[in-house]
Design a protein with these regions (language model features):
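Alpha-helical structural context detector biased toward long hydrophobic helices
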Residues: 1-219
Length: 219
């Protein structure tokens, strides 16, 4: 509990109140993490995002009428009133619901199928076949100063039984089909990077980056 609080206590937390006829749905894997900033910048070609990333969005449906949302205010602006956001557009609720389809393990829970059937098939096609990618690298060169590894396909591992091997696993994320109308960019938004596999992180995690290369990045 304390570890989670330390990681996320710089995020802004609000409740979304649903004023539409489309209820929030939930699933056997209801909490989801996404990042509009990473998708906008096409950063997933280089690294995945996590809980420390610049542009974090965390969503958890609570009931058909309410949904919890935590976001990086250094990247996004959401016009809520004292922590409550009233949503009156069906498409905004559809944004939240699509992730229950994309992220669920086996089951989706809902109190009405009328609106759900309209977009279920569309988002079902966007589900990833796998949620993780594993990359293998074998030792290619070694000196007293450094080691260099080269990436190989998994089918070649049998040829390197006696070699030093690095295994890297990254999380794959479904790309949303739509984004909600209430999620605006903070025009002064920023984060930090050191051009490393850490990616772009929030200011809170700036100290985890190599101080020689850390620099500020804008949205």
């Amino acid at each position: 509990m304390n570890i989670g609080f330390h990681i996320l206590n710089d995020l802004t937390c609000i409740l979304i109140k649903n004023f539409t006829d489309v209820p929030f749905i939930t699933s056997d894997n209801p909490a989801f993490l996404t990042n509009r900033y990473y998708f906008k910048k096409d950063l997933l070609k280089y690294f995945s995002f996590g809980l420390n990333s610049m542009g974090t969005l965390l969503v958890l449906p609570i009931s058909p009428e309410y949904c919890f949302l935590a976001y990086d205010k250094k990247v996004y602006f959401i016009p809520h009133n004292r922590g409550i956001l009233k949503v009156k557009k069906d498409k905004d609720i559809e944004f939240m619901n699509q992730f229950q389809i994309l992220n669920c393990n086996d089951n989706i829970y809902l109190n009405s199928t009328s609106s759900f059937e309209k977009y279920y098939e569309k988002y079902l096609k966007l589900r990833l076949a796998s949620r993780h990618k594993i990359t293998y690298s074998v030792l290619d060169e070694s000196t007293y100063k450094h080691k260099r590894f080269k990436v190989i396909p998994s089918s070649d591992l049998k040829n390197y039984k006696d070699s030093e091997i690095l295994t890297h696993m990254s999380t794959l994320h479904s790309r949303p089909d739509i984004w909600p109308s209430f999620l605006h960019w903070n025009i002064r938004g920023y984060g930090f990077s050191s051009n490393s596999g850490e990616g772009h992180v929030r200011e809170k995690f700036k100290e985890t980056l190599d101080p020689k290369y850390v620099h500020r990045v804008k949205i």
